Amino acid sequence: MCIRDSFAAALPMLVAQILNLLYNIVDRIYIARIPHIGTAALGAVGLCFPLVVIITAFANLFGSGGAPLFSISRGQKRNKQAVHIMNTSFTMVCFSAVVLMLIGLLFARPLLILFGASKDALVYAFPYMMIYLIGTLPSMIAIGMNPFINAQGYSTIGMFSVAIGAVANLLLDPFFIFALGFGVRGAAIATVISQCLSASFVLFFLTKKAELKVRFLHKNELSESLGYAKNIISLGTAGFIMQLTNGLVSIVCNNVLSVTGGDIYISVMTIVSSVRQLVETPIYAMNEGGSPILSYNYGARRPARVRKAMVVMSAMILCYTAVMWSVIIFAPGTLIRVFSSDPSLVKDSIPALNQYFAAFIFMDLQYIGQTVFKSLNKKKHAIFFSLLRKVFIVIPLTYFMPYVLHMGTSGVFLAEPVSNVIGGSFCFITMLCTVLPELRRMDNCD
């Protein structure tokens, strides 16, 4: 894997991830500019972020969990097994989407209160959440099955499937929010329509055009698929836990901020989270672009190419993050004003952003380690490090620093860099100490 190959693999993924980011980011940009209620509505919609994370986490549990196994099987020339893995993932994606939608619709209000919503915030958050939930199935199909398009070498098609929905959302948002006067509800409607368009294209391609085509599992295949399902869930659990704990951290942060800073700091956290999504998107793209290459060459027993892919992917990610970290530290207002022009909100967001991203480059080490572990089917390592940083470091610190050390809202934002340094370093060092010796042994055996 040379630098050219890395860019070739990562570029379509980068464009796809940026376009996918538009689903939520564009909503927030437009919502923040609704006259008179923009700042309050922005915070309220930010309270729905854990729900979006949960839906995405389940989609990736089966999609990103299945795609590396799919790639490994293709690398081993076992196409029949690869198709069975993809069909198993697809069936699980659809079933879980229906279950999540029903649970969400039944318990939307208590969930939002759990997420930290005040009575005022519920006015905007509840209708947005109810409409968004209707699009759970198309959302999960678009997210969960797109990795199988990329894993077959159709990365440009994968990018296009995301582009369809993202561009539609970009155009429909102002129409429903401002032209029709639907406000927050309009943003949710536009998102659901856009997700339906993306899902339709993904299904069309995977059922009609792809080399290896997808379908629902037949009844007589269910028992045989249990083994594949367990492996998919085992491998996808690391990313699932990482995303799910992102939602848990968001809930904890919003609850602490609502006490220490009030509703305005929910809006501040929404902006900080939005900037993080914006900055992380190319990192995700580079990881996802490199993951099939790592998996394929590992399955084909080509350790030299696995090592080279690891080095190139790591170098690209670290260089990019160094540039973005400089922008965040030295020009934070530029990024914040993308999401809101409210002077008081911008003023409160600048120190919060600087604190939150103080040691962000260490987070790269976590991402690189997680991607390598996942791509090489190292389930236990991937799951452990998913849990370590979020559950055992950042969440306790989010309570400890504001309440015990009396740091107020600053304690919430500073919990992130402390966890980045500890968790990221530990994950990366462990990856080097476990994966590199295995690759050397593979060299010797061959």
What are the roles of these predicted feature ranges?
Residues 42-102, 139-158, 254, 266-326, ...:
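Small-residue-rich hydrophobic transmembrane alpha-helices
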Residues 8-27, 131, 165, 194-198, ...:
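Transmembrane helical elements of multi-pass membrane transporters/channels
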Residues 104, 147, 173, 177, ...:
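Structural signal for membrane-spanning alpha-helices in multi-pass inner-membrane proteins
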Residues 4-37, 50-65, 69, 94-101, ...:
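N-terminal transmembrane alpha-helices
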Residues 1-10, 70-135, 181-236, 294-359, ...:
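Short alpha-helical transmembrane segments in multi-pass integral membrane proteins
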Residues 18, 22-43, 112-119, 175-182, ...:
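Helix-terminus/linker motif at the lipid-water interface of multi-pass membrane proteins
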Residues 39-50, 125-129, 188, 261-278, ...:
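Small-residue hotspots at the loop-to-helix junctions and early N-terminal turns
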Residues 60-63, 132-150, 158-166, 187-202, ...:
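Short runs within selected transmembrane alpha-helices of multi-pass transporters and secretion channels
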